């Protein structure tokens, strides 16, 4: 530490300057003591005045002498080198003023945000556990190391059973025509025609509905090679909306233990679009909103709503 301070500094003069500061403080204290005591210990007024003035002048001379000595020593002390390494203490000037730093309010806001995030995460976890999105009946509750991974039973149903389920659903709804094909092997693809309103391409994996595309009744649903077009969207915004709602319905109707009930429930929901352009909104009572009919159908009551009115 002494080596660091000695760079450009006269330590002997520095020590003498400290002693000079102490002497100056004593001299100044004696001046104020003299002023405090005033004129004393003399019988006549003239004698007291002369004694006070003489004593006061002596104290002032002492202050002047000590001050001159301190100035002389300060010139001998010297200045520390500007290249003196300050390390982390050199960063103190960069710190903001503590009174002007909103640290408490920022910490309080972060704490509230963290609590709100934890609360909503818990709600989301509970809802996801109630409406499980798992696409198979196999619930992997035990580690895979303890038991072999079983094949989901939903994916190994025989094609004859799938054909029978689709045939029964086709007979349930006279205004709905279902054409089943298997262009890629065992996986079925359905072309559902609902009256003269719309057509729906349903891609299935066994009895699990994997994807749906809704198009207008007069739109082309085939590719150039004669296969069902399962990738291109409808050219009309109304059927694009219905496609989005159908995808939401697939996530709502989930019962892995009874896949035939899932398909029947989805087809029942899809059949409610037979009056897509005839049913008014149950909330506002209008047929059109922003140029679109009510495209949403309630999953339980099958009532028609505009996309904004269902909120």
Swiss-Prot record:
<dbReference type="GO" id="GO:0070847">
    <property type="term" value="C:core mediator complex"/>
</dbReference>
<dbReference type="GO" id="GO:0006357">
    <property type="term" value="P:regulation of transcription by RNA polymerase II"/>
</dbReference>
<keyword id="KW-0804">Transcription</keyword>
<dbReference type="GO" id="GO:0035019">
    <property type="term" value="P:somatic stem cell population maintenance"/>
</dbReference>
<dbReference type="Pfam" id="PF11571">
    <property type="entry name" value="Med27"/>
</dbReference>
<keyword id="KW-0597">Phosphoprotein</keyword>
<dbReference type="InterPro" id="IPR021627">
    <property type="entry name" value="Mediator_Med27"/>
</dbReference>
<keyword id="KW-0539">Nucleus</keyword>
<dbReference type="GO" id="GO:0016592">
    <property type="term" value="C:mediator complex"/>
</dbReference>
<comment type="function">
    <text>Component of the Mediator complex, a coactivator involved in the regulated transcription of nearly all RNA polymerase II-dependent genes. Mediator functions as a bridge to convey information from gene-specific regulatory proteins to the basal RNA polymerase II transcription machinery. Mediator is recruited to promoters by direct interactions with regulatory proteins and serves as a scaffold for the assembly of a functional preinitiation complex with RNA polymerase II and the general transcription factors.</text>
</comment>
<keyword id="KW-0010">Activator</keyword>
<feature type="modified residue" description="N6-methyllysine">
    <location>
        <position position="134"/>
    </location>
</feature>
<keyword id="KW-0805">Transcription regulation</keyword>
<dbReference type="GO" id="GO:0005654">
    <property type="term" value="C:nucleoplasm"/>
</dbReference>
<dbReference type="GO" id="GO:0003713">
    <property type="term" value="F:transcription coactivator activity"/>
</dbReference>
<keyword id="KW-0488">Methylation</keyword>
<dbReference type="GO" id="GO:0005829">
    <property type="term" value="C:cytosol"/>
</dbReference>
<protein>
    <recommendedName>
        <fullName>Mediator of RNA polymerase II transcription subunit 27</fullName>
    </recommendedName>
</protein>
<feature type="modified residue" description="Phosphoserine">
    <location>
        <position position="132"/>
    </location>
</feature>
<dbReference type="GO" id="GO:0005730">
    <property type="term" value="C:nucleolus"/>
</dbReference>
<comment type="similarity">
    <text>Belongs to the Mediator complex subunit 27 family.</text>
</comment>
<comment type="subunit">
    <text>Component of the Mediator complex, which is composed of MED1, MED4, MED6, MED7, MED8, MED9, MED10, MED11, MED12, MED13, MED13L, MED14, MED15, MED16, MED17, MED18, MED19, MED20, MED21, MED22, MED23, MED24, MED25, MED26, MED27, MED29, MED30, MED31, CCNC, CDK8 and CDC2L6/CDK11. The MED12, MED13, CCNC and CDK8 subunits form a distinct module termed the CDK8 module. Mediator containing the CDK8 module is less active than Mediator lacking this module in supporting transcriptional activation.</text>
</comment>
């Amino acid at each position: 530490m002494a080596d660091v301070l000695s760079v450009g500094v006269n330590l002997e003069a520095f020590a003498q300057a400290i002693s000079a500061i102490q002497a100056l403080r004593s001299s100044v204290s004696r001046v104020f003591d003299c002023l405090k005591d005033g004129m004393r210990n003399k019988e006549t007024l003239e004698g007291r005045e002369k004694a006070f003035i003489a004593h006061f002048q002596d104290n002032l001379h002492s202050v002047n002498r000590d001050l001159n000595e301190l100035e002389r020593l300060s010139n001998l002390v010297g200045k520390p080198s500007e290249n003196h390494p300050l390390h982390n203490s050199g960063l103190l000037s960069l710190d903001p003023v503590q009174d002007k730093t909103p640290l408490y309010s920022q910490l309080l806001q972060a704490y509230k945000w963290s609590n709100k995030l934890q609360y909503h995460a818990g709600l989301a976890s509970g809802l996801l556990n109630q409406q499980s999105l798992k696409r198979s009946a196999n619930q992997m509750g035990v580690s895979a190391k303890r038991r072999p991974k079983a094949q989901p039973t939903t994916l190994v149903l025989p094609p004859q059973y799938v054909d029978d389920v689709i045939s029964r659903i086709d007979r349930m709804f006279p205004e709905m025509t279902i054409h089943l094909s298997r262009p890629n092997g065992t996986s079925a693809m359905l072309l559902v025609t609902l009256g003269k309103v719309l057509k729906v391409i349903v891609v299935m994996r066994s009895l699990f509905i994997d994807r749906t595309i809704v198009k207008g009744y007069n739109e082309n649903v085939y590719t150039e090679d004669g296969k069902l077009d399962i990738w291109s969207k409808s050219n009309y915004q109304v059927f694009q909306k219905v496609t989005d709602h159908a995808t939401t319905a697939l996530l709502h109707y989930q019962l892995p233990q009874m896949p035939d009930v899932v398909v029947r429930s989805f087809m029942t929901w899809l059949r409610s679009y037979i009056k897509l352009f005839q049913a008014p909104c149950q909330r506002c009572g209008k047929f059109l909103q922003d140029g679109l009919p009510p495209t949403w159908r309630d999953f339980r009551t099958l009532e028609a709503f505009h996309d904004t009115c269902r909120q």
